[in-house]
Amino acid sequence: CAYILDDELYNKIFLIANASLYPHYTLLKQNATYFIPLKTDDIHVQRGLFFPWKVGISKRLVIPDLDKYTSNLPKNQIPIMENFTLNLDKVNHMAICGNSGSGKSYALTYLLSVLKNQSDLIIVDPKFDSPSRWAREHKIAVIHPVENRSKSDFVSEVNERLSQCLNLIQQRQAILYDNPRHEFAHLTIVIDEVLALSEGVNKAIKESFFSLLSQIALLGRATKIHLLLVSQRFDHTTIPVSVREQLNVLIQIGNINSKSVQFLFPDLNPEGIVIPTGHGTGLIQVIDNEHPYQVLPLLCPTYYTTEGIL
């Protein structure tokens, strides 16, 4: 019996093996067939199909007191799930994507609570919603729309702040030129519902916003300046392609199918990935040298925080 060694065969084996091994092991979805050489001189069996895997399945963190939990975290550590923690020093920029009601704001509030002890924060909240309430509780300034100002004025204010961040990047680059080992404090620019900023504004203002975002995304890594972007979608009308290519923590929450993942994970076919049901579930990909680069099932932490924020 002969088989064509192609992506179709590889995916069929993946579907069978991933379901059969659940919940003891999780196979990591590949975008294409993964061959490895075998130690033999027989040309007929010198190759094998390899399926990367990890022990166990994704498990949700349950946090009874979020403020107490985040105040005791080690420096630059961002726990996402059990046995899955991000190192802020290895993070370039982050994106959270999901349809309305999927749990984006809940996930963002968690990340804000963790980051407040590890990074300076600049928060842009076009909806004047939960990020603003969280910031009020923690006495952090927020850029938000004001009743008697136009949307173009609001986005211009955002551009002004992004321009200041770009100047800071250039100042830090000059310091790094003389001392490459200089340690900077992290600065995270949080923009909730990016699509609300880039739609329906003056073309010149939008182009300025995109240009500033692109420059920060491209230059911010070495100077410890990060973007945390949240949106219902991340197509080219929401953020420039150059920004999307610099994201190395990608989170998709909510309904998972080939259409919903097409912007953050354009090469991914989610078929066969076992995604738990419930709020705050989805996919995560972390592109660094500490985590497998494949997409993993995600369960966002469950936590309890100050009443009136969410």
Residue ranges and their predicted role:
Residues 2-9, 178-182, 235-238:
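Short acidic, glycine/proline-enriched loop segments that cap or flank alpha-helices
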Residues 95, 186-191:
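Structural motif
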Residues 12-18, 231-309:
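Conserved ATP-driven motor cores of ASCE-family P-loop NTPases powering translocation/secretion/packaging/pilus
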Residues 1-91:
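Basic- and hydrophobic-enriched, low-structure N-terminal and domain-boundary segments
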Residues 28, 176-177, 254, 258:
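Secondary-structure transition/capping residues
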Residues 173-188, 202:
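Short helix/loop segment immediately N-terminal to the Walker
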Residues 49-174, 195-255, 306-309:
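P-loop NTPase catalytic phosphate-binding loop
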